[in-house]
């Protein structure tokens, strides 16, 4: 990494040291367990600034024996999705869409790359995410690349702090498919989490 890049990253990293650990209880994690029924896969989400194309955030959707979202140093959360140190359990299709909707807005697109993998590789990625621990701010790209690097079939993923570099390498993997998510929501998305939580409760009340 160039010295100029390190000079930009290190002050942020040092200021953010001591990531907040979160540990949902066993019963919540067990209750939230979601099996998608889809072939195993790993999906990389990159939040990209529309003006300039800078990668601002990385997250991993791992579809293994259960479907989880590794959202390192992320700010998305939902009351129905228990979290353990940046790993979110119970990622149903609705929650996956909530995650995308939270990040995509008038100033950011969400770029999705999905790669099919064997059940063994998916499970290996899940175990790595479970054991990774809480991630400091500005280390999302670094933690995602840490998890991917060395997985069978992902050897070309570099260890890097930069989400765009992870995305560019991921895009070159065999079988990778791409989708871009656009949204015109205002840049201030502080109310999105409240709306998502409220809409889920309303659906539950209707079903009951």
Predicted regions and their residues:
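Second-shell loop/turn segments in exported
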Residues: 46-49, 56-57, 107-115, 126-135, ...
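Acidic helix-start/capping segments at beta-turn-to-alpha-helix junctions
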Residues: 76, 108, 116, 120, ...
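Soluble non-cytosolic domains of exported or imported proteins
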Residues: 53, 89-93, 115-120, 134-142, ...
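Bacterial N-terminal signal peptides that target proteins for export
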Residues: 1-6
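Activation targets extended, charge/polar-rich intrinsically disordered C-terminal tails
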Residues: 19-26, 124-208
